[in-house]
Swiss-Prot record:
It is a single-pass membrane protein. This is NADPH--cytochrome P450 reductase. It is found in: Endoplasmic reticulum membrane. The chain crosses the membrane at residues 15-35. CDD domains: CYPOR (cd06204). It comes from the Eukaryota. It comes from Musca domestica (House fly). This enzyme is required for electron transfer from NADP to cytochrome P450 in microsomes. It can also provide electron transfer to heme oxygenase and cytochrome B5. Binds 1 FAD per monomer. Residues 77-221 form the Flavodoxin-like domain. Belongs to the NADPH--cytochrome P450 reductase family.
């Protein structure tokens, strides 16, 4: 009975008894409940069919017990990974796969999708082992997917007696907090009573992290065998993790065409937008900043209106690029493949949470264009598998040798692969007898990762726009080939003058922040595109001044090669100087015979530097090259603090560390 009909009956029969009224109320409530229940039943299929099972490595909340999975499948090895770019996840997969050789059936697990308190139950599984492959990210932080685990292990006081573990860290020595996360987790697990089975391994991405991992791994397994009393090991057998399923009859609307997780997410956009659900932002400006010199630097403006994404000056924007179509076609021809074949790669381990290496079903063309790093330098395990597809024994031995841990093999890999910047396409072009099936290539190559850029605008001025400042990466290799940066080449082609163009993006929050009090003075060091976040800072300080706020000194040290060629945003910066918002210090390294860099200017301005960071307790920022510039600037600061602040070197170093803890010293650097 409808609510409208109930109202009619009541008006016509005003003398109903109490019982009649009570019955009517019951009927009304019942009808409402039935109506709402029916609607929920009708809506349920819409939700379940429009949101596809995620195809990245995740476990649903009802399947987050890794202990149950280990016990149910007779496994004793679990390898957790904390990964931002995919390398730690790749290493974890390789360790779990190799466990079979040593009679340890393993599984890979994402700590973000697991109940990590179950580590306490590992002791209930005989001869069990937990391995942690953990990257350090940003300013000594855990990766996004390891954050909760890191906080839990830091703040918790659990008893992990009976847990056997090992840790391998991924870091970069050019950064101050080298492998901080892995070092801490290794130490903390021992403090909580766990047993270290093998020594901490540390990989350096600035050198050869692949070599570091292999060297550690090849000593790790013998120690594991000794610890658990495992005698001997099986032969090394190359096994496929995924099986091929060609699907010519799949309906076109069920095929992934570049979506990160949810099918049709690019056509049917809905917030919140993040790494698994990027927003398609329109490119509204794409202009050249360099006025000469042969290099290219782009100023790009993206429209994020309607996305509900918010950003602050200093945040990063991540962009999902696509691979060069020419390279994709080349790879298809080298593998003698029909790139438009629809297929799925299905994990042979039915208990794994990672059902596919990337969204499936899809086509080879889409996989190679949107999902796989075809321009990356292949790691040694890929060469080992490629060797099996060589018809020429010399080629097979050559690849196997480069994949080995012998000094000769390592040297060949360094020279022929790394120093020559050979990617998978180049390898197959140069080794004519190597013709692997395209599906195995898709299994071996790592996932194409988003590229991160410092946002070069302030949301105070541009709440619905995000600005990017990026140099086009392009260089000639020793083999005579021209390698191009995946993301910057992709952006270079996005010209809004030829029609609407969009790119998939999301915002990543940062700790790189202006002082909360505008009157605090700041010093910024940003040569080249290191200027990017400071452009946003300066815009914001100007905005505050225009609004009547008191704003402290805003000092920028900027450097480039030549004033008339690559002095980016020159007119803007000079305008800020004219109106009193900015003090600008410039170094043009090639405009005179003797090169001048920003580090020279900072040394010359020792009194000013000390006044701002020592006497006025101002903030100091660095953005740019981590390997040389950032290290040099930090060393100069130590000297300035020693001489002007009357400190010894140790005290000066501690002063900078104190500034870091107070968020007065911040670095946004890359190598």
């Amino acid at each position: 009975m409808s609510a409208e009909h109930v109202e009619e009956v009541v008006s016509e029969e005003p003398f109903l008894g109490t019982l009649d009224i009570a019955l009517l109320v019951v009927l009304l409530v019942g009808a409402t409940w039935y109506f709402m229940r029916s609607r929920k039943k009708e809506e349920a299929p819409i939700r379940s069919y429009s949101i596809q099972p995620t195809t990245v490595s995740t476990v649903s909340t009802t399947e987050n017990s890794f202990i149950k999975k280990l016990k149910a499948s007779g496994r004793s090895l679990v390898v957790f990974y904390g990964s931002q770019t995919g390398t730690a996840e790749e290493f974890a997969g390789r360790l779990a796969k190799e466990g079979l050789r040593y009679r340890m059936k393993g599984m890979v697990a994402d700590p973000e999708e697991c109940d990590m308190e179950e580590l306490l139950q590992m002791k209930d599984i005989p001869n069990s082992l937990a391995v942690f492959c953990l990257a350090t990210y940003g300013e000594g932080d855990p990766t996004d997917n390891a954050m909760e685990f890191y906080e839990w292990i830091t703040n918790g006081e659990v008893d992990l007696t009976g847990l056997n573990y090992a840790v391998f860290g991924l870091g970069n020595k050019t950064y101050e907090h080298y492998n901080k996360v892995a070092i801490y987790v290794d130490k903390r697990l021992e403090e909580l009573g766990a047993t270290r089975v093998f020594e901490l391994g540390l990989g350096d991405d600035d050198a050869n992290i692949e070599d570091d991992f292999i060297t550690w791994k090849d000593r790790f397994w013998p120690s594991v065998c000794d610890f658990f009393g495992i005698e001997g090991s099986g032969e090394e057998v190359l096994m496929r993790q995924f099986r091929l399923l060609e699907q010519p009859d799949v309906q076109p609307d069920r095929i992934y065409t570049g979506e990160i997780a949810r099918l049709h997410s690019m056509q049917n956009q809905r917030p919140p937008f993040d790494a698994k659900n990027p927003f398609l932002a329109s490119v509204i400006v794409n202009r050249e900043l360099h006025k000469g010199g042969g290099r290219s630097c782009m100023h790009i403006e993206l429209d994020i209106d309607g996305s509900k994404m918010r950003y602050d000056a200093g945040d990063h924007i991540a962009m999902y690029p696509i691979n060069d179509k020419i390279l994709v076609e080349k790879l298809g021809k080298l593998c003698d493949a029909n790139l438009d074949t629809v297929f799925s790669l299905i994990n042979t381990d039915t208990d794994s949470s990672k059902k596919h290496p990337f969204p499936c079903p899809t086509t080879y063309r889409t996989a190679l264009t949107h999902y796989l790093e075809i321009t990356a330098i292949p790691r040694t395990h890929i060469l080992k598998e490629l060797a099996e597809y060589c018809s020429d024994e010399k080629d097979k031995e050559f690849l196997r040798n480069m994949a080995s841990i012998t000094p000769e093999g390592k040297e060949k890999y360094q020279n022929w692969i790394q120093n020559s910047s050979r990617n998978i396409v180049h390898i197959l072009e140069d080794i004519k007898s190597c013709r692997p099936p395209i599906d195995h290539i898709c299994e071996l190559l790592p996932r194409l990762q988003p590229r991160y850029y410092s946002i070069s605008s302030s949301s105070k001025l541009y709440p619905t726009n995000v600005h990017i400042t990026a140099v086009l990466v392009q260089y000639e290799t020793p083999t005579g080939r021209v390698n191009k940066g995946v993301a910057t080449s992709y952006m270079k082609e996005k010209n809004p003058s030829v029609g609407e163009v969009k790119v998939p993006v999301f915002i990543r929050k940062s700790q790189f922040r202006l002082p909360t009090k505008s009157e605090i003075p700041i010093i910024m060091v940003g040569p080249g595109t290191g200027l990017a976040p400071f452009r946003g800072f300066i815009q914001e300080r100007q905005f505050l001044r225009d609004g009547g706020k008191v704003v402290g000194d805003t000092i920028l040290y900027f450097g480039c090669r030549k004033k008339d060629e690559d002095f980016i945003y020159r007119e803007e910066l000079e305008q800020y100087v004219q109106n009193g918002t900015l003090t600008l210090k410039t170094a043009f390294s090639r405009d005179q015979q003797e090169k001048i860099y920003v580090t020279h200017l900072i040394e010359q301005d020792a009194d000013l530097i000390w006044k701002v960071i020592g006497e006025q307790k101002g903030h100091f920022y660095i953005c740019g090259d981590a390997k040389n510039m950032a290290v040099d600037v930090r060393n100069i600061l130590v000297k300035i603090l020693s001489t002007k602040g009357n400190m010894n070197e140790s005290d000066a170093v501690q002063y900078i560390k104190k500034m870091e803890a107070q968020k007065r010293y911040s670095a946004d650097v890359w190598s």
